[in-house]
């Protein structure tokens, strides 16, 4: 199938290519291509526009285009008719699909015709997928007229847009062809006219080359004219040549961009299937969510928006089709929902204007605008009341809300209000009223609340309207709107991240020990203190108790309302006439009714409090276990709820104020708001914090020592309060409400009411007077290093107690006595150890120096090992003896008494409790083998020591023994179970990993896995078949034995065959499962390979087109370069010099005008950073190329000389080294070899030394022949040969009178041959070797050294010795020469 398709496509491509080549060859060349002025028109490719078509080719092309368009019109009409018939039920879906296929075929033929004419059709590439998505959406529904009316307008709009585009392109083709025909004769006429003008303008000053003419030189003018005539059409061709289009560069950039975009979705592209494509197209045809979808890109053609003719200010009810599709993926039709239906009467008029089409954010602004009338916070009010709200609002608008755009006459959409999550219950007063706009309500999301807010409490200066029904309705819509929850989450995230950032900064400041920075950061982090004045616990009867209980059953949470407004004056003191009733809400607020004013608060801190409140409320209800009453002591719940609280404590701000006991109703237990809040979680608290101008510190009240409920009132304020009630305003400013409730001291135990109705006999003792800390003392900070309280923490047996002391301990004995008094333990002097915990590292260490013991230190007491074991044994033996004694006594009493007692003895109960404790200990410490072993030893010891007297009833003893056995068996079972648990977990992990590997389709299953699984399955099948053949042979043999030979088969044979058949069945099942496992993986791999094949085909096609674009770009570039080269050669031949630059002077007014113009242009500039960076890079590359091109003439010549290999081949460095080695060897032989051999043989040694010592020539007297020979050697550059004649006066020789040398004795000078000798023979000489050696002692110090390398000749020294030279002396001499050479160098 693929081969046939490839052949067909190859034949089609070859035929098209040959046709296009023939058409191209038949076109005439022309040098200018007209570009349409319309912005939508694309540049015409060179292959289609470099030369105009002939008349026959143009007419044929136009007729082909017209025929294609006509066929396309007919098919579109058939498509509309098929849709109509489909809605009537006369045709099915397949008929519509076949018409669609025909339509797409005609569409592709039409686009191909336009492409041959040089018209780009890229704007129509998305039409097939758009039409397909609309048709799929239509055919999904049941055939009906309603379904057709819903989707038929979309089909018609797509078809109309297609036909209009084709009509426009058809007219464009005709105009271009006509224009190219008319341009050809006109260009010919212009060329002829230019030639005539050149001939006629040689003598005039208005010639065509007047810019290169010097009027003062007739000769130069003639040279210029003749030079310009050598390239007559260079300038004209350069002017008529269009700019380089860079087709290949643009195509490559698009390809790279597509590749980068596809990298992110490579996994999805690799997993594409037919079903997934259909599902994607089906989903793409549905309208997206406007809130979540990004703003669409601007399409090259405007969206088709049909408006009603009678009203242009209203949006059309018909859907709008946005055709800005992404070419990389399957396009989709984005339909804008009708806004006319959703606009309510309360919507501003600006939202109904057509300007919404310009901004996609207007759809969001409609919802935001309609909900922001009554809950909007102005910028000024927000900055004064809530300093941190501006930044948070800005961050919210940046992340979630589209920027405010201009809506109808420059009106800007207002900003969103601050975070307000109001969730009101049906019984809440907020159901009928709303809060003012400057009062955001902060509640945990998803929490129910009962709000007791009075209308009179709102600030009159706020200016908010509460009576408007529209504002109430819009506020409720805004509070219930799910679209703003994400914005609230962003505020929470920003607040939490800001707080974490401050905490990290504080830690860094602490590490750097910067005190000022720490204080400033802590000031930002902490909330401002709330004053303790004017706080009250007032009753609230706005919410019924039943409703409160019903809401609390659904969500047992303590909620809070923090209201923000501005105070004008302080509230007066509250009277004590108000009492606390059960079931009411606790509220601290103004008596004037004003709400709390957070002057220095921030939204981040409020969000943090709400989050802490949520965390506290999500914890289990047993958090308040300290405040629960036992069922036996508290009596019935109804009686407890019927009690009324008339008692309380009073807080006074005066230093002399004391808390006294109220004399009324002392016997009545307290069941007030605190008890109700603790025992009845359905009760709620409403807190409104008040900030006065002079804040004061809260008042602390210690817990009264009485065990019964007492109440006291202050003689000054008489305000009822809760015991140990740290002011709720202060507590709420630093912790959630649930934390405030948990910090309230537990209420005393209430005696149960007497059944007979008599008053309780439990006495109520009077509490001591509670000292009250003054505000001034509380406000003053404690000095550093001074402990106001003196106490230690003592720990023994995992119990820690706080012990107060009057003075610091002086020695370890006092500390031991303190432990003995607290824990009632006895010990000897050295039988215990004391450990202390370091407060910084939390590490315990042995207390050796009492200077480490400070107040508030944690000290642990423990016995040493031996004493600990002994104490443990004594403890166990004491327990056993106590059990024996008590059980024996109780058993005797039971025998004496009657047998009517049904309950077991106390000893048996104690034994059962201890056994339960042991069982719990085993269950908790089952992983510790040593602990289990030790406990078993203790139990065996306890059982052995437990001797039962004969007089004791054996019934209980047998029960205990049975329980002991059961416990031992349970212990064994649990140990075995916990031993198997790690193995089971390990196996389970292996199975999970295998399952994940098999289940994950992204696992590296490639062609290798397919081949390996194929081989494995083949091997398994082969083995199964072989085993099957063996079993078949055995069964056939057994069958023949039974039928023919009448042999009785053995049962062992039949059983074995049954086992083998069962084994084969299992193997077959395994093989089947293997096939089922690999089948989906193989299919997935096939899909990937098919996708890879398609992508590779696309790669080849795209790069083939890219190569064609490169060729066309190269031809255009060559044309422009040839024209520029011709002009450059023309100018180089002419002797005209370039005109010097002349600077024009401007007046001050002109300079001012230029400056203003430049400044205006700078203001109007909209720089593109990416384009500027690209331009900078291009300029840098051009500059580098210019620098590389700057090469002088000498460098060019040397480079050419070396590249052409014009140097003579003389052997190079290797040849020079070889020659030097040969010369060195010759010199060594001449100087030393003969001399050393003669000395060893004892021939003429002394005479040679005497004679050579006498032959010391004058420094300035040189024989002529020797000098010539030396100069000849130096001219040839032979350093080594010249050394034969250079001798140096030895410092060891004794100076003697100079003698006149006899020049006649030198008949033939010793001249070394400069040729490259290979033998060691010397030139013929009249003298012997000794004479040669003596002649070598002559020193030529005045020799003119012409070459630098001959300077080393002066370094050679020959010492005249008066003693016999041996081999050791020769070696020492060489060493001396080396040292001397080094020193000279």
From Swiss-Prot:
Gene3D superfamilies: Actin interacting protein 3, C-terminal domain (1.20.58.1540). This is Actin-interacting protein 3 homolog. PANTHER family: COILED-COIL DOMAIN-CONTAINING PROTEIN CG32809 (PTHR22741:SF10), P140CAP/SNIP-RELATED (PTHR22741). The keyword Phosphoprotein applies. Keywords: Coiled coil, Cytoplasm, Cytoskeleton, Phosphoprotein. To yeast BUD6. Residues 177-186, 258-274, 419-440, 447-472, 528-543, 574-591, 883-903 have a biased composition (Polar residues). Involved in the organization and/or function of the actin cytoskeleton. Transmembrane segments: none annotated. It comes from Schizosaccharomyces pombe (strain 972 / ATCC 24843). The modification Phosphoserine is found at residue 602. It comes from the Eukaryota. One of its GO terms (molecular function) is cytoskeletal regulatory protein binding. Residues 1-55, 177-234, 251-369, 401-486, 505-708, 752-776, 882-903, 1312-1340 are annotated as: Disordered. One of its GO terms (biological process) is establishment of cell polarity. Residues 620-629, 638-647 have a biased composition (Basic and acidic residues). GO terms for cellular component: actin cap; cell division site; cell tip; cytoplasm. Residues 1009-1096 form a coiled coil. Residues 202-214, 350-362 have a biased composition (Low complexity).
